[in-house]
């Protein structure tokens, strides 16, 4: 009777463990969607950092510089002059770094925040890959001191926060018509006649939203409260 009772207990535990695995894998499928969303968010974040169209300056000041459009980015400024007939000759770009004195605080801080956002996003992807691997292999425990789902969610939300600060600060600078004292060799005036939001800011906004959404999905992952994940036989 004792052996039969033990065998029955073992069978029940195995069924319970199998049910737990099915539940966890089903729940993890939502996290796979979150992983896809986070991947797109990271890609858009990297693209926005490299784009130059953060601020669109429309210049019509013949006495100071040739008329045209200046695209002000985080790492360079590109000027498109209207008086050139050849498009390839109309574009002139100048690179700058964090150490250039003429850069305003918003661009300096934005450079660091965008770099931090990309690093946090990559770390978040690494954690979610580890978390999904553990779930599908059935080795993730409810009482883990460092839950990779939670870690990934926090990292993605932090990355979203960094990008959001950059977006809001640059949007404020555009709306308040703040200028930049570029070197005279750039032939760009301190302020344009018209300043508008560029496509890079829109891409960054979408990246921030996707990273926030993926982080929320990762944090929503829960374990079954009434199932023991690793029963001892």
What is each residue range found by the language model?
Residues 81-96, 160-167, 201-216:
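Juxtamembrane/interfacial segments around transmembrane helices
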Residues 30-40, 106, 110-126, 130, ...:
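Physicochemical signature of membrane-embedded alpha-helices that form the seven-helix bundle of GPCRs
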Residues 89-103, 177, 213-225:
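Alpha-helical membrane-embedding segments
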Residues 1-73, 79, 134-145, 183-202, ...:
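Intrinsically disordered terminal tails
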Residues 88-93, 134, 175-186:
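Peri-membrane helix termini and adjoining interfacial loops of integral membrane proteins
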Residues 52-111:
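A surface-exposed beta-alpha-beta supersecondary segment
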Residues 48-56, 131, 162-183:
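Helix-to-loop junction signature of class
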Residues 78, 121, 168-171:
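Transmembrane alpha-helix/helix-exit interface in multi-pass inner-membrane proteins
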């Amino acid at each position: 009777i004792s052996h039969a009772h033990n065998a029955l207990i073992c069978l029940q535990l195995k069924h319970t463990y199998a049910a737990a695995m099915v539940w966890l894998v089903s729940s993890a499928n939502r996290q796979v969607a979150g992983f896809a969303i986070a991947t797109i968010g990271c890609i858009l974040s990297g693209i926005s950092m490299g784009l130059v169209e953060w601020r669109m300056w429309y210049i019509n000041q013949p006495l100071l510089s040739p008329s045209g459009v200046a695209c002000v980015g985080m790492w360079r400024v590109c000027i498109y002059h209207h008086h050139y007939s050849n498009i390839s000759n109309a574009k002139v770009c100048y690179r700058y770094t964090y150490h250039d004195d003429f850069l305003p605080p918003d661009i300096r801080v934005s450079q660091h925040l965008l770099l931090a956002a990309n690093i946090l996003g990559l770390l978040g992807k690494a954690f979610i890959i580890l978390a999904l691997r553990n779930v599908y292999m059935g080795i993730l425990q409810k009482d883990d001191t460092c839950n990779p789902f939670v870690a990934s969610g926090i990292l993605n939300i932090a990355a979203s926060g960094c990008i959001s600060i950059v977006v809001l600060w640059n949007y404020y600078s555009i709306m308040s018509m703040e200028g930049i004292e570029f070197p005279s060799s750039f032939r760009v005036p301190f302020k344009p006649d018209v300043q508008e939001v560029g496509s890079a800011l829109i891409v960054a906004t979408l990246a921030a939203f996707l990273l926030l959404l993926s982080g929320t999905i990762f944090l929503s992952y829960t374990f079954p409260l009434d199932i023991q994940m690793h029963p001892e036989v």
